[in-house]
Amino acid sequence: VIGGDECNINEHRFLVALYDPDGFFCGGTL
């Protein structure tokens, strides 16, 4: 994302992020 801003936990409940032991690897929307 270019020009995006970080959000607080629970601020956008329809977004998901998938993590494995190495860190973030995928994201999406519900």
From Swiss-Prot:
Q: Which domain of life is it from?
A: Eukaryota
Q: In which tissues is it expressed?
A: Expressed by the venom gland.
Q: Spell out the subcellular localization from the entry.
A: Secreted
Q: What is its EC number?
A: 3.4.21.-
Q: Which GO terms describe its cellular component?
A: extracellular region
- Mention one GO molecular function: serine-type peptidase activity
SUPFAM superfamilies given for it? Trypsin-like serine proteases
GO BP terms: proteolysis
The record's comment on protein family reads: Belongs to the peptidase S1 family. Snake venom subfamily.
Q: Give the function comment from the record.
A: Thrombin-like snake venom serine protease that cleaves alpha-chain of fibrinogen (FGA) releases only fibrinopeptide A. Shows coagulant, esterase and amidase activities.
How is this protein named in the record?
Thrombin-like enzyme LmrSP-2
Q: Which organism is it from?
A: Lachesis muta rhombeata
